[in-house]
Amino acid sequence: MLPSIDGRIVLRDWKVAGLTREYETTAATFGADGWIIGRISMEPYAGKARVPARRNGAPVPRKDFVAKHDATSYAIAIDPSGKLRWDQSDIDGEHVITVLTESVSDDYLAFLQSKGVSYLFGGKSRIDVAKVLRKLRKSFGIKTLLLEGGGKINGSFLAADLIDELSVLVAPVADGSIGTPSLFDVASRRSPARSLKLLSIEKRSGGIVWLRYMRSR
């Protein structure tokens, strides 16, 4: 992740050279099988295709749909209500998997199948992220995954204690925006705070600091 010094993750008006380059360079060192983000973060990549209404046809079973299981990398979206309008089934060659709840419409499932977009069900009305990770490993062989936001998705993984390592590129920016998403946002009165063990600190170009932690057992 790429937060400001005060933990904000929306890069609006951040005048720091090389942020994207440093992010991509450090992310590549993990050799991950794919990356996972929330619906809002994925919207710029998805497209604006129309979801056609089916006039006839049997109900679409609420079963996982695997369009491709041998991709070299995967782009995964958490999209509980089925709002992303995919133009194609990959992002720069990375096969798209979308994670849904069973409440999505038959029209949307038929649309995803027509586009060749794989989908998994993470629950009936809410996403169980632990269940999703098990399915990703079983159906696609995904063992290492980059969790890349936004704050609510990060928070759901934190609350479920599913983050093995935390890699943070701290930008030399004090953002100060009120109401801006932070690195972890959890909608719960009970804090899911986790203890971490520092692995390394590295100064990168442009005043960026790369912090790496692992969870403390």
Kindly give the residue locations of the regions a language model identified.
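Enzymes that bind and transform nitrogen-containing heteroaromatic metabolites
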Residues: 1-217
